[in-house]
Protein backbone atom coordinates (compact mmCIF):
# COMPACT_ATOMS: atom_id res chain seq x y z
CA UNK A 1 0.00 0.00 0.00
CA UNK A 2 1.49 3.29 -1.12
CA UNK A 3 1.17 6.24 1.25
CA UNK A 4 0.37 9.48 -0.56
CA UNK A 5 2.87 11.73 1.19
CA UNK A 6 1.94 14.87 -0.71
CA UNK A 7 -1.70 14.47 0.38
CA UNK A 8 -0.71 14.03 4.03
CA UNK A 9 1.66 16.99 3.78
CA UNK A 10 -1.05 19.28 2.42
CA UNK A 11 -3.50 18.23 5.17
CA UNK A 12 -0.88 18.88 7.86
CA UNK A 13 -0.03 22.27 6.35
CA UNK A 14 -3.73 23.19 6.31
CA UNK A 15 -4.13 22.12 9.96
CA UNK A 16 -1.09 24.18 10.98
CA UNK A 17 -2.41 27.24 9.13
CA UNK A 18 -5.84 26.89 10.77
CA UNK A 19 -4.44 26.51 14.28
CA UNK A 20 -5.25 29.47 16.49
CA UNK A 21 -4.12 29.74 20.05
CA UNK A 22 -6.98 31.17 22.14
CA UNK A 23 -5.72 32.66 25.33
CA UNK A 24 -8.40 32.81 28.05
CA UNK A 25 -7.65 34.97 31.06
CA UNK A 26 -9.41 34.08 34.30
CA UNK A 27 -9.03 35.91 37.56
CA UNK A 28 -8.59 33.25 40.22
CA UNK A 29 -8.41 33.48 44.01
CA UNK A 30 -7.85 31.02 46.84
CA UNK A 31 -10.07 30.07 49.79
CA UNK A 32 -8.35 31.19 53.02
CA UNK A 33 -11.05 29.98 55.41
CA UNK A 34 -14.52 28.49 55.11
CA UNK A 35 -17.27 27.96 57.66
CA UNK A 36 -20.95 28.63 58.38
CA UNK A 37 -21.73 29.36 54.73
CA UNK A 38 -19.09 32.12 54.45
CA UNK A 39 -15.76 31.84 52.59
CA UNK A 40 -12.85 34.30 52.90
CA UNK A 41 -11.07 34.42 49.56
CA UNK A 42 -7.62 35.87 48.80
CA UNK A 43 -7.07 37.34 45.34
CA UNK A 44 -9.96 38.37 43.07
CA UNK A 45 -8.71 41.98 43.18
CA UNK A 46 -11.20 43.20 40.54
CA UNK A 47 -14.30 41.31 41.69
CA UNK A 48 -17.47 43.44 41.87
CA UNK A 49 -19.84 43.59 44.82
CA UNK A 50 -22.66 41.10 44.25
CA UNK A 51 -20.77 39.25 41.48
CA UNK A 52 -21.09 35.48 41.23
CA UNK A 53 -17.92 33.46 41.80
CA UNK A 54 -17.39 29.75 41.13
CA UNK A 55 -15.45 27.37 43.40
CA UNK A 56 -13.36 24.63 41.80
CA UNK A 57 -15.97 21.97 42.63
CA UNK A 58 -18.73 23.86 40.75
CA UNK A 59 -20.51 25.44 43.75
CA UNK A 60 -21.39 29.11 43.28
CA UNK A 61 -21.03 31.96 45.74
CA UNK A 62 -21.58 35.72 45.74
CA UNK A 63 -19.03 38.39 46.65
CA UNK A 64 -20.52 40.33 49.56
CA UNK A 65 -17.69 42.01 51.46
CA UNK A 66 -14.85 43.63 49.50
CA UNK A 67 -11.99 44.13 51.98
CA UNK A 68 -8.33 45.19 51.66
CA UNK A 69 -6.78 41.73 51.51
CA UNK A 70 -9.72 39.40 51.05
CA UNK A 71 -13.25 39.02 49.74
CA UNK A 72 -16.14 37.76 51.92
CA UNK A 73 -18.14 35.32 49.80
CA UNK A 74 -21.50 33.81 50.75
CA UNK A 75 -21.86 30.24 49.51
CA UNK A 76 -25.03 29.18 47.64
CA UNK A 77 -24.70 25.50 48.36
CA UNK A 78 -23.22 23.11 50.89
CA UNK A 79 -20.13 24.85 52.31
CA UNK A 80 -18.93 21.51 53.78
CA UNK A 81 -17.90 20.48 50.25
CA UNK A 82 -15.45 23.40 50.04
CA UNK A 83 -11.99 23.23 51.60
CA UNK A 84 -9.23 25.71 52.36
CA UNK A 85 -6.96 26.15 49.37
CA UNK A 86 -9.73 25.63 46.78
CA UNK A 87 -9.45 27.94 43.79
CA UNK A 88 -12.25 30.44 43.14
CA UNK A 89 -12.80 32.19 39.80
CA UNK A 90 -14.79 35.23 38.76
CA UNK A 91 -17.77 34.71 36.45
CA UNK A 92 -18.31 38.37 35.42
CA UNK A 93 -22.06 38.03 35.93
CA UNK A 94 -24.60 38.69 38.66
CA UNK A 95 -26.99 36.16 40.18
CA UNK A 96 -29.80 35.29 37.77
CA UNK A 97 -32.66 32.79 37.99
CA UNK A 98 -34.59 31.03 35.23
CA UNK A 99 -38.00 32.60 34.54
CA UNK A 100 -40.95 31.86 32.30
CA UNK A 101 -44.11 29.77 31.99
CA UNK A 102 -42.01 26.57 32.23
CA UNK A 103 -41.77 27.12 36.01
CA UNK A 104 -45.55 27.06 36.60
CA UNK A 105 -46.60 24.06 38.67
CA UNK A 106 -43.04 23.41 39.83
CA UNK A 107 -41.23 23.56 43.19
CA UNK A 108 -37.79 25.16 42.92
CA UNK A 109 -35.01 26.28 45.24
CA UNK A 110 -33.99 29.98 45.30
CA UNK A 111 -31.51 29.38 42.45
CA UNK A 112 -34.35 28.12 40.24
CA UNK A 113 -33.25 24.46 40.38
CA UNK A 114 -36.14 21.95 40.58
CA UNK A 115 -36.55 20.13 43.90
CA UNK A 116 -39.82 18.30 43.17
CA UNK A 117 -38.27 15.31 41.36
CA UNK A 118 -40.11 16.06 38.10
CA UNK A 119 -37.03 16.48 35.92
CA UNK A 120 -35.24 19.55 34.59
CA UNK A 121 -36.94 22.88 33.84
CA UNK A 122 -36.04 24.00 30.34
CA UNK A 123 -36.62 27.71 30.87
CA UNK A 124 -35.50 29.84 27.93
CA UNK A 125 -34.99 33.10 29.83
CA UNK A 126 -33.30 34.31 33.01
CA UNK A 127 -33.73 37.48 35.08
CA UNK A 128 -31.40 39.08 37.63
CA UNK A 129 -32.45 38.28 41.19
CA UNK A 130 -31.91 41.91 42.22
CA UNK A 131 -33.57 44.30 39.79
CA UNK A 132 -34.65 47.92 40.25
CA UNK A 133 -38.22 48.74 41.27
CA UNK A 134 -40.37 50.53 38.66
CA UNK A 135 -40.17 54.32 38.92
CA UNK A 136 -43.02 56.74 39.59
CA UNK A 137 -43.69 57.35 35.88
CA UNK A 138 -44.06 53.62 35.24
CA UNK A 139 -46.82 53.18 37.84
CA UNK A 140 -50.50 53.95 38.06
CA UNK A 141 -52.68 54.16 41.19
CA UNK A 142 -54.00 50.87 42.54
CA UNK A 143 -57.67 50.54 41.63
CA UNK A 144 -58.44 46.96 40.65
CA UNK A 145 -59.40 44.45 43.36
CA UNK A 146 -57.30 41.39 44.21
CA UNK A 147 -60.06 39.25 45.72
CA UNK A 148 -58.91 37.04 48.59
CA UNK A 149 -62.21 35.16 48.91
CA UNK A 150 -62.17 35.95 52.64
CA UNK A 151 -65.24 37.96 53.68
CA UNK A 152 -63.59 39.91 56.52
CA UNK A 153 -60.73 41.04 54.26
CA UNK A 154 -62.53 41.74 50.97
CA UNK A 155 -65.20 43.77 52.76
CA UNK A 156 -63.18 45.75 55.31
CA UNK A 157 -59.46 45.55 54.43
CA UNK A 158 -59.60 45.33 50.63
CA UNK A 159 -56.43 44.50 48.70
CA UNK A 160 -55.82 45.93 45.23
CA UNK A 161 -53.67 44.59 42.40
CA UNK A 162 -50.22 46.12 42.85
CA UNK A 163 -50.63 46.67 46.59
CA UNK A 164 -48.38 45.40 49.39
CA UNK A 165 -50.47 44.15 52.30
CA UNK A 166 -48.68 42.81 55.36
CA UNK A 167 -50.12 39.80 57.21
CA UNK A 168 -48.86 40.00 60.79
CA UNK A 169 -49.51 37.95 63.92
CA UNK A 170 -48.11 35.43 66.39
CA UNK A 171 -47.31 31.91 65.32
CA UNK A 172 -50.32 29.66 64.90
CA UNK A 173 -52.83 32.44 64.18
CA UNK A 174 -53.54 31.42 60.56
CA UNK A 175 -51.25 33.80 58.61
CA UNK A 176 -50.25 31.22 56.00
CA UNK A 177 -53.89 30.09 55.65
CA UNK A 178 -54.99 33.59 54.59
CA UNK A 179 -52.21 33.78 51.99
CA UNK A 180 -52.95 30.30 50.62
CA UNK A 181 -56.71 30.99 50.49
CA UNK A 182 -55.91 34.08 48.41
CA UNK A 183 -53.89 31.89 46.01
CA UNK A 184 -56.79 29.38 45.77
CA UNK A 185 -59.19 32.24 45.04
CA UNK A 186 -57.21 33.28 41.94
CA UNK A 187 -58.32 30.12 40.10
CA UNK A 188 -59.75 31.07 36.73
CA UNK A 189 -58.79 34.75 37.01
CA UNK A 190 -55.53 34.50 35.06
CA UNK A 191 -53.47 35.73 38.03
CA UNK A 192 -50.05 34.04 38.31
CA UNK A 193 -49.07 33.21 41.91
CA UNK A 194 -45.64 32.69 43.50
CA UNK A 195 -45.43 31.23 46.99
CA UNK A 196 -42.03 31.76 48.66
CA UNK A 197 -41.46 29.55 51.72
CA UNK A 198 -38.53 30.82 53.82
CA UNK A 199 -37.05 28.79 56.68
CA UNK A 200 -40.04 26.47 57.00
CA UNK A 201 -39.97 22.75 57.72
CA UNK A 202 -39.68 20.68 54.54
CA UNK A 203 -42.72 18.66 55.68
CA UNK A 204 -44.82 21.85 55.94
CA UNK A 205 -43.83 22.93 52.42
CA UNK A 206 -44.63 19.44 51.10
CA UNK A 207 -48.13 19.52 52.63
CA UNK A 208 -48.71 23.05 51.23
CA UNK A 209 -47.72 21.90 47.72
CA UNK A 210 -49.98 18.84 48.05
CA UNK A 211 -52.92 21.05 49.12
CA UNK A 212 -52.36 23.41 46.16
CA UNK A 213 -52.19 20.41 43.81
CA UNK A 214 -55.40 18.86 45.17
CA UNK A 215 -57.28 22.16 44.81
CA UNK A 216 -56.04 22.63 41.23
CA UNK A 217 -54.05 25.75 42.13
CA UNK A 218 -50.55 24.44 41.38
CA UNK A 219 -50.99 24.88 37.63
CA UNK A 220 -50.83 28.71 37.96
CA UNK A 221 -48.42 28.76 40.93
CA UNK A 222 -44.64 28.59 41.35
CA UNK A 223 -43.37 27.45 44.77
CA UNK A 224 -39.92 28.73 45.79
CA UNK A 225 -38.67 26.91 48.87
CA UNK A 226 -35.65 27.55 51.10
CA UNK A 227 -36.29 25.24 54.04
CA UNK A 228 -34.87 25.49 57.55
CA UNK A 229 -32.21 22.96 56.49
CA UNK A 230 -30.93 25.21 53.69
CA UNK A 231 -27.98 27.55 54.29
CA UNK A 232 -28.72 31.15 55.40
CA UNK A 233 -27.65 32.65 52.02
CA UNK A 234 -30.36 30.64 50.22
CA UNK A 235 -33.00 31.75 52.74
CA UNK A 236 -31.85 35.34 52.27
CA UNK A 237 -32.06 35.23 48.47
CA UNK A 238 -35.40 33.32 48.25
CA UNK A 239 -37.81 36.32 48.27
CA UNK A 240 -35.83 38.15 45.57
CA UNK A 241 -35.83 35.02 43.38
CA UNK A 242 -39.60 34.60 43.76
CA UNK A 243 -40.10 38.29 42.96
CA UNK A 244 -38.01 38.01 39.76
CA UNK A 245 -40.05 35.00 38.62
CA UNK A 246 -43.26 37.02 39.10
CA UNK A 247 -41.76 40.13 37.44
CA UNK A 248 -41.31 38.16 34.21
CA UNK A 249 -45.11 37.70 34.01
CA UNK A 250 -45.74 41.35 34.97
CA UNK A 251 -43.30 42.91 32.46
CA UNK A 252 -43.14 40.37 29.61
CA UNK A 253 -46.64 38.84 29.63
CA UNK A 254 -48.45 41.93 31.06
CA UNK A 255 -50.27 39.75 33.60
CA UNK A 256 -51.45 40.30 37.16
CA UNK A 257 -49.26 38.42 39.65
CA UNK A 258 -49.41 37.67 43.37
CA UNK A 259 -46.34 36.89 45.50
CA UNK A 260 -46.52 35.57 49.06
CA UNK A 261 -43.36 35.87 51.20
CA UNK A 262 -43.78 33.40 54.08
CA UNK A 263 -42.17 34.80 56.11
CA UNK A 264 -39.83 37.80 56.09
CA UNK A 265 -38.96 37.47 59.81
CA UNK A 266 -37.00 34.32 59.01
CA UNK A 267 -35.35 36.02 56.04
CA UNK A 268 -34.21 38.88 58.32
CA UNK A 269 -32.78 36.31 60.78
CA UNK A 270 -30.87 34.60 57.94
CA UNK A 271 -29.52 37.98 56.78
CA UNK A 272 -28.50 38.84 60.35
CA UNK A 273 -26.61 35.54 60.57
CA UNK A 274 -24.76 36.25 57.31
CA UNK A 275 -23.94 39.83 58.30
CA UNK A 276 -22.58 38.87 61.72
CA UNK A 277 -20.43 36.10 60.19
CA UNK A 278 -19.11 38.64 57.68
CA UNK A 279 -18.26 40.82 60.70
CA UNK A 280 -20.51 43.68 59.68
CA UNK A 281 -21.33 45.91 62.68
CA UNK A 282 -24.58 44.92 64.45
CA UNK A 283 -27.32 47.44 65.26
CA UNK A 284 -30.66 47.21 67.08
CA UNK A 285 -31.54 43.59 68.07
CA UNK A 286 -28.16 42.67 66.44
CA UNK A 287 -29.62 43.22 62.96
CA UNK A 288 -27.27 45.02 60.55
CA UNK A 289 -27.85 48.68 59.72
CA UNK A 290 -29.30 47.97 56.28
CA UNK A 291 -32.05 45.56 57.34
CA UNK A 292 -34.68 48.18 56.46
CA UNK A 293 -33.29 48.35 52.92
CA UNK A 294 -33.33 44.53 52.81
CA UNK A 295 -37.14 44.60 52.89
CA UNK A 296 -37.83 47.96 51.24
CA UNK A 297 -35.99 47.09 48.01
CA UNK A 298 -37.95 43.83 47.84
CA UNK A 299 -41.41 45.27 48.52
CA UNK A 300 -40.92 48.35 46.30
CA UNK A 301 -40.83 45.95 43.33
CA UNK A 302 -44.59 45.42 43.79
CA UNK A 303 -46.49 47.75 41.46
CA UNK A 304 -49.43 48.33 39.18
CA UNK A 305 -47.78 49.31 35.89
CA UNK A 306 -49.07 52.15 33.74
CA UNK A 307 -51.08 51.23 30.63
CA UNK A 308 -48.23 52.15 28.29
CA UNK A 309 -46.05 49.54 30.02
CA UNK A 310 -48.70 46.85 29.65
CA UNK A 311 -50.74 47.46 32.86
CA UNK A 312 -49.38 44.29 34.52
CA UNK A 313 -49.22 44.14 38.30
CA UNK A 314 -47.34 42.49 41.14
CA UNK A 315 -49.20 42.24 44.45
CA UNK A 316 -47.11 41.35 47.49
CA UNK A 317 -48.38 39.64 50.65
CA UNK A 318 -45.43 39.64 53.05
CA UNK A 319 -45.90 37.73 56.31
CA UNK A 320 -44.27 38.72 59.60
CA UNK A 321 -44.37 36.62 62.76
CA UNK A 322 -44.55 38.54 66.04
CA UNK A 323 -43.57 37.36 69.51
CA UNK A 324 -46.42 37.66 72.05
CA UNK A 325 -48.19 40.23 69.86
CA UNK A 326 -45.22 42.62 70.03
CA UNK A 327 -45.71 44.70 66.88
CA UNK A 328 -43.33 47.43 68.06
CA UNK A 329 -40.26 45.21 67.61
CA UNK A 330 -37.69 46.21 64.98
CA UNK A 331 -38.63 44.08 61.95
CA UNK A 332 -42.45 44.40 62.38
CA UNK A 333 -42.28 48.23 62.59
CA UNK A 334 -39.97 48.33 59.56
CA UNK A 335 -42.28 46.25 57.38
CA UNK A 336 -45.43 48.03 58.63
CA UNK A 337 -43.89 51.33 57.50
CA UNK A 338 -42.98 49.93 54.05
CA UNK A 339 -46.30 48.25 53.20
CA UNK A 340 -49.65 49.78 52.16
CA UNK A 341 -51.55 48.38 55.11
CA UNK A 342 -51.61 45.38 57.39
CA UNK A 343 -53.89 42.56 58.45
CA UNK A 344 -53.44 41.89 62.18
CA UNK A 345 -54.24 38.40 63.42
CA UNK A 346 -54.80 38.03 67.17
CA UNK A 347 -54.17 34.78 69.02
CA UNK A 348 -57.04 35.42 71.49
CA UNK A 349 -59.53 35.79 68.60
CA UNK A 350 -58.15 32.59 67.06
CA UNK A 351 -58.49 30.74 70.37
CA UNK A 352 -62.10 31.90 70.82
CA UNK A 353 -63.06 30.44 67.42
CA UNK A 354 -63.12 33.65 65.36
CA UNK A 355 -61.39 32.36 62.28
CA UNK A 356 -59.89 34.00 60.27
CA UNK A 357 -58.68 35.78 63.44
CA UNK A 358 -58.53 39.24 61.83
CA UNK A 359 -58.62 42.15 64.27
CA UNK A 360 -60.66 44.56 62.15
CA UNK A 361 -60.11 47.44 64.57
CA UNK A 362 -56.36 47.77 63.99
CA UNK A 363 -56.08 46.24 60.52
CA UNK A 364 -56.01 48.77 57.68
CA UNK A 365 -55.68 48.92 53.93
CA UNK A 366 -54.18 52.21 52.80
CA UNK A 367 -55.69 51.72 49.35
CA UNK A 368 -59.17 51.40 50.81
CA UNK A 369 -62.36 51.28 48.78
CA UNK A 370 -60.48 52.08 45.55
CA UNK A 371 -59.75 48.35 45.53
CA UNK A 372 -63.40 47.27 45.75
CA UNK A 373 -66.10 46.70 43.16
CA UNK A 374 -69.11 49.03 43.46
CA UNK A 375 -71.33 46.25 44.88
CA UNK A 376 -68.94 45.69 47.78
CA UNK A 377 -68.68 49.44 48.44
CA UNK A 378 -72.50 49.57 48.63
CA UNK A 379 -72.64 47.05 51.47
CA UNK A 380 -69.28 47.08 53.27
CA UNK A 381 -68.95 50.66 54.52
CA UNK A 382 -71.91 50.23 56.84
CA UNK A 383 -70.58 46.94 58.18
CA UNK A 384 -67.20 48.30 59.26
CA UNK A 385 -68.92 51.07 61.22
CA UNK A 386 -71.40 48.66 62.83
CA UNK A 387 -68.62 46.28 63.82
CA UNK A 388 -66.57 49.09 65.41
CA UNK A 389 -69.63 50.29 67.39
CA UNK A 390 -70.35 46.68 68.40
CA UNK A 391 -66.84 46.28 69.87
CA UNK A 392 -67.38 49.41 72.02
CA UNK A 393 -70.85 48.28 73.14
CA UNK A 394 -69.60 44.77 73.88
CA UNK A 395 -67.12 46.09 76.44
CA UNK A 396 -69.89 48.26 77.96
CA UNK A 397 -72.40 45.36 78.06
CA UNK A 398 -69.99 43.21 80.07
CA UNK A 399 -70.55 45.52 83.03
CA UNK A 400 -73.94 43.81 83.37
CA UNK A 401 -76.05 46.96 83.24
CA UNK A 402 -79.59 46.95 81.83
CA UNK A 403 -79.54 47.78 78.12
CA UNK A 404 -82.27 49.63 76.23
CA UNK A 405 -83.84 47.75 73.27
CA UNK A 406 -81.98 49.80 70.61
CA UNK A 407 -78.59 49.01 72.17
CA UNK A 408 -79.53 45.34 72.56
CA UNK A 409 -80.57 45.20 68.89
CA UNK A 410 -77.23 46.72 67.89
CA UNK A 411 -75.37 44.16 70.00
CA UNK A 412 -77.37 41.31 68.45
CA UNK A 413 -76.65 42.54 64.93
CA UNK A 414 -72.94 42.88 65.82
CA UNK A 415 -72.93 39.27 67.01
CA UNK A 416 -74.55 38.19 63.74
CA UNK A 417 -71.90 40.05 61.73
CA UNK A 418 -69.14 38.33 63.74
CA UNK A 419 -70.74 34.93 63.10
CA UNK A 420 -71.21 35.68 59.39
CA UNK A 421 -67.54 36.63 59.00
CA UNK A 422 -66.35 33.26 60.33
CA UNK A 423 -65.07 31.12 57.50
CA UNK A 424 -63.43 27.69 57.34
CA UNK A 425 -59.95 27.38 55.86
CA UNK A 426 -59.47 26.65 52.11
CA UNK A 427 -63.00 27.72 51.18
CA UNK A 428 -62.80 31.15 49.54
CA UNK A 429 -66.10 32.81 48.55
CA UNK A 430 -66.70 34.50 45.16
CA UNK A 431 -67.27 38.23 45.62
CA UNK A 432 -70.93 38.16 44.49
CA UNK A 433 -71.75 35.61 47.24
CA UNK A 434 -69.95 37.75 49.83
CA UNK A 435 -71.97 40.79 48.74
CA UNK A 436 -75.29 38.94 49.17
CA UNK A 437 -74.39 37.68 52.66
CA UNK A 438 -73.11 41.06 53.84
CA UNK A 439 -76.19 42.82 52.39
CA UNK A 440 -78.42 40.37 54.27
CA UNK A 441 -76.74 40.86 57.65
CA UNK A 442 -76.28 44.66 57.50
CA UNK A 443 -79.77 45.50 56.13
CA UNK A 444 -81.55 43.51 58.82
CA UNK A 445 -82.54 40.45 56.77
CA UNK A 446 -80.87 38.18 59.32
CA UNK A 447 -82.23 39.89 62.44
CA UNK A 448 -84.79 37.12 63.03
CA UNK A 449 -82.24 34.31 62.60
CA UNK A 450 -80.90 33.06 65.98
CA UNK A 451 -77.22 34.04 66.43
CA UNK A 452 -76.19 30.38 66.83
CA UNK A 453 -77.69 29.53 63.41
CA UNK A 454 -76.23 32.44 61.40
CA UNK A 455 -73.46 30.34 59.80
CA UNK A 456 -75.88 27.53 58.94
CA UNK A 457 -78.28 30.10 57.46
CA UNK A 458 -75.44 31.66 55.43
CA UNK A 459 -74.86 28.33 53.65
CA UNK A 460 -78.61 27.77 53.19
CA UNK A 461 -79.05 31.30 51.80
CA UNK A 462 -76.29 30.93 49.19
CA UNK A 463 -77.42 27.45 48.13
CA UNK A 464 -81.04 28.62 47.74
CA UNK A 465 -80.03 31.70 45.74
CA UNK A 466 -77.76 29.61 43.46
CA UNK A 467 -80.59 27.13 42.81
CA UNK A 468 -83.65 29.42 42.60
CA UNK A 469 -82.46 32.99 42.06
CA UNK A 470 -79.18 32.58 40.18
CA UNK A 471 -79.91 35.73 38.15
CA UNK A 472 -79.22 37.77 41.34
CA UNK A 473 -75.62 36.49 41.51
CA UNK A 474 -75.17 36.75 37.73
CA UNK A 475 -76.22 40.40 37.73
CA UNK A 476 -73.76 41.31 40.54
CA UNK A 477 -70.99 39.37 38.79
CA UNK A 478 -71.55 41.11 35.44
CA UNK A 479 -72.49 44.64 36.49
CA UNK A 480 -70.25 44.68 39.61
CA UNK A 481 -73.02 46.52 41.48
CA UNK A 482 -76.40 45.82 43.13
CA UNK A 483 -78.73 47.32 40.53
CA UNK A 484 -82.04 46.47 42.25
CA UNK A 485 -81.79 46.57 46.06
CA UNK A 486 -85.57 46.16 46.50
CA UNK A 487 -85.67 42.94 44.52
CA UNK A 488 -82.68 41.55 46.44
CA UNK A 489 -84.42 42.52 49.70
CA UNK A 490 -87.57 40.61 48.68
CA UNK A 491 -85.55 37.51 47.81
CA UNK A 492 -83.69 37.64 51.15
CA UNK A 493 -86.95 38.07 53.12
CA UNK A 494 -88.45 35.02 51.37
CA UNK A 495 -85.39 32.85 51.99
CA UNK A 496 -85.25 33.87 55.68
CA UNK A 497 -88.95 32.98 56.16
CA UNK A 498 -88.45 29.58 54.50
CA UNK A 499 -85.43 28.87 56.72
CA UNK A 500 -87.31 29.79 59.90
CA UNK A 501 -90.27 27.59 58.87
CA UNK A 502 -87.96 24.60 58.35
CA UNK A 503 -85.90 25.12 61.52
From Swiss-Prot:
- Gene Ontology terms for molecular function: ADP binding; ATP binding; proton-transporting ATP synthase activity, rotational mechanism
Annotated family: Belongs to the ATPase alpha/beta chains family.
Q: What class of enzyme is it?
A: translocase
Its topology with respect to the membrane? Peripheral membrane protein
Q: What is its main location?
A: membrane
The record lists the lineage as:
Bacteria, Pseudomonadati, Spirochaetota, Spirochaetia, Leptospirales
**SUPFAM superfamilies to which the protein is assigned, alphabetical:** C-terminal domain of alpha and beta subunits of F1 ATP synthase (SSF47917), N-terminal domain of alpha and beta subunits of F1 ATP synthase (SSF50615), P-loop containing nucleoside triphosphate hydrolases (SSF52540)
One matching Pfam family is: ATP-synt_ab
- GO process annotations (BP): proton motive force-driven ATP synthesis
Subcellular locations according to the entry: Cell inner membrane
Q: Which GO terms describe its cellular component?
A: plasma membrane; proton-transporting ATP synthase complex
State what protein this is by name: ATP synthase subunit alpha
* Keywords assigned by UniProt, alphabetized: ATP synthesis, ATP-binding, Cell inner membrane, Cell membrane, CF(1), Hydrogen ion transport, Ion transport, Membrane, Nucleotide-binding, Translocase, Transport
Q: How would you summarize the oligomeric state and partners of this protein?
A: F-type ATPases have 2 components, CF(1) - the catalytic core - and CF(0) - the membrane proton channel. CF(1) has five subunits: alpha(3), beta(3), gamma(1), delta(1), epsilon(1). CF(0) has three main subunits: a(1), b(2) and c(9-12). The alpha and beta chains form an alternating ring which encloses part of the gamma chain. CF(1) is attached to CF(0) by a central stalk formed by the gamma and epsilon chains, while a peripheral stalk is formed by the delta and b chains.
Q: Which transformation does this protein catalyse, written as a reaction?
A: ATP + H2O + 4 H(+)(in) = ADP + phosphate + 5 H(+)(out)
Query: Which PROSITE patterns does this one have?
Result: ATPASE_ALPHA_BETA
CDD domains from the entry? ATP-synt_F1_alpha_C, ATP-synt_F1_alpha_N, F1-ATPase_alpha_CD
Sites binding ATP sit at 169-176
Site note Required for activity, residues = 363
Amino acid sequence: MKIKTDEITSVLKQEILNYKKDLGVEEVGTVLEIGDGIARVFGLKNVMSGEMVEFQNGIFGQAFNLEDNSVGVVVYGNYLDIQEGFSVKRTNRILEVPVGPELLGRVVNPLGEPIDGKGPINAKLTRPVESPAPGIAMRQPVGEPMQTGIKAIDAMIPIGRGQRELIIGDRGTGKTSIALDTILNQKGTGVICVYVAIGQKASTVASTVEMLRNKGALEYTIVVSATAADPAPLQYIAPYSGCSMAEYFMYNEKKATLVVYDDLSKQAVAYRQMSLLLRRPPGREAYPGDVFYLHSRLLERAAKLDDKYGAGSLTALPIIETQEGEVSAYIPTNVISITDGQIYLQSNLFASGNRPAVDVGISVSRVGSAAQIKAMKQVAGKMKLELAQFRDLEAFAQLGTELDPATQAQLDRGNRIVQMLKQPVSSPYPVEEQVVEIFAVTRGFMDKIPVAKVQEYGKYLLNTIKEQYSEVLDSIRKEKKISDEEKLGEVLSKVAEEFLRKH
